[in-house]
Amino acid sequence: MFPLRAQSASLGANSTLFFRAYAVSHRKSGSKIQAWKGLKRGANGANRANGTNSSQPESQSSKAVFQSGKFSQLHQPSKKVYEKSSSGLDSISTFEQLRIFPTVRAAMVAEIKSTYNMKGPRYQSKDELVLKPTPIQVAAIRKINQPRLKNNKNVKEEEVSAGRKSAPSTADLVNEEFKKINSLQKLKVFTLAAETGSGKTWAYLSSLLSKLKEDEFGLYESSEEKYRASRNAQMVKSVVLVPTHDLVEQVYSTLERANSIKFDVEKIGANSRLKEFLQLPEQNGSLNLSILKWGSGEAHKKLFDRCLKGRVDVLVTTPGKLASLSKLQNVNRPYRFLNHVEYCVLDEADTLMDESWIETTMPVIEKFKKLRDLIICSATIPKRFQTTLNRIFPTDDSIINIVTPSLHKLPKQIKVSVIDSELSPYHGSKTRALAQALYAITRDGTEPGLVKRVIVFVNKKESVNSLVDTLVNKFSHRPEDVIGITGEDKPEERSEKLEPFIKPAESIEEDPLNSKIKVLVTSDLMARGVNFVGIKNVIIMDIPHNSVDLVHRIGRTGRMNQSGRVILIVDKKKNKAWLSGLPNAVKRGIQMG
């Protein structure tokens, strides 16, 4: 085998038994949604999952939190969770120090460089870039890529059933199923939480792709016949679930770029047996994984036909698409290709596990009877999301929590300012304040020679088109320079509108429309997960309803340690006193509550 950094593993549960308990909890409650409402009973066990002491206030887990009443909806992990996740971060400074399959590492680094927004004269080309893994990448890869223990003697099955004297609660049932199966080592459950723009996608993709390649190499070592049979098997090996079709496209595009990157096996350090494997025709030169996206408007036949041709290594889709398979009445066993899914990622999990999604998400995961790793990934931990996690995974041996020291902190490289539209020269007009801000951005001397790009957030989709019309008709912006996106746009329309904002800024000379500025007006639809590459300017026209949405909106800029600025426009209705303290909180690196 290739040299790897081995770590000890903490084990999770078996999906079949767990989701059986999930179904029991539904029947007991009489309502599906009631089972996930985060009831307070059993809270002490839930707190153990997060390392908190139920007798102490939650605020003791962090030094300083910027919060304001009901607006603050972010959960603060305990000091214990932070310490476990942060241990050894400073000792890792290169991707070579992490347990990543060699060809996956080569493809990952090349893909990250290919999308990097070059700035300043320091580097002449992207080949000169020296990339370092981000804290979430270090923490996640070290935990998720730990080799599985062959024997786990920490939990004995007789210990699980011993001492029961009364009827167990729903939480006890779920917890018991986890404990029972720990000795069988079937499933490990991870949560990843890190600040926006911190490299979470590659934190889980590098782990996922490494596991797929390690599995292939393991089969090849045991039997070339088994290896060939596995490649031809009619099955899906792993699934990445995201809440929107825009994110389906984004994750799929990242995978496809990495999958197509060429590399020289001779330059990849490997022992003779691994090198022999990498020189196989189907392994040599690129990752050559079978990657499938199943998005909006695509028929079930696309999934079925692809699986019939052989193994799908990674399926990128939404829970809704997979749930739709249950409605097929003319197809025999529509979920049969998913019976052997071993790895599943829930990206933007706080959305996928909220009350409006969980009845779709959980039954889908229940179909993955052979699941080994479940990775639950999010940029924020809303309090309601944490309550849901506590109910599903109530003890510290049922889940592995991974967070970064900067979770819920807004990046210091973002400059935040507040404009009071009640003051002169705006005289109560927020749109006039917006127009003035856009005018100033075009003339501020930043990004010389490049098309400036600005994202403007409003609270209601009805406000999107009216604001676009106002900027065009009243403030003389060119129609081609101001774009509105709402949920009513078709996926292909959204993709076309997003194009200028999800790729590096073009030079003014190269822009086909000769634009100096492009403005995207949208709602929270575009605030989560979308990787706006190199966006420097975000304007929040309407203050969001809670701190969770504020963090996500601000997080569309300042990604991957690049600079950005955020302008909040307020009026007498929304000029909350605490807003004036936000810029200083960002400078000081204080967590949002």
From Swiss-Prot:
Entry EC number(s): 3.6.4.13
Source organism superkingdom: Eukaryota
Keyword field contains Transmembrane helix: no
Domain Helicase C-terminal: 433-593
Boundaries of every Helicase ATP-binding domain copy: 181-399
GO function terms (MF aspect): ATP binding; ATP hydrolysis activity; RNA binding; RNA helicase activity
List of residues binding ATP: A194, E195, T196, G197, S198, G199, K200, T201
Transit sequence range: 1-106
Keyword tags: ATP-binding, Helicase, Hydrolase, Mitochondrion, Nucleotide-binding, RNA-binding, Transit peptide
GO CC annotation, single: mitochondrion
InterPro entries on file: DEAD/DEAH_box_helicase_dom (IPR011545), Helicase_ATP-bd (IPR014001), Helicase_C-like (IPR001650), P-loop_NTPase (IPR027417)
Motif residue range(s): Q motif: 130-137
Function noted in UniProt: ATP-binding RNA helicase involved in mitochondrial RNA metabolism. Required for maintenance of mitochondrial DNA.
Family: Belongs to the DEAD box helicase family. MRH4 subfamily.
Protein's recorded name: ATP-dependent RNA helicase MRH4, mitochondrial
Organism from which the protein derives: Scheffersomyces stipitis (strain ATCC 58785 / CBS 6054 / NBRC 10063 / NRRL Y-11545) (Yeast)
UniProt gene name: MRH4
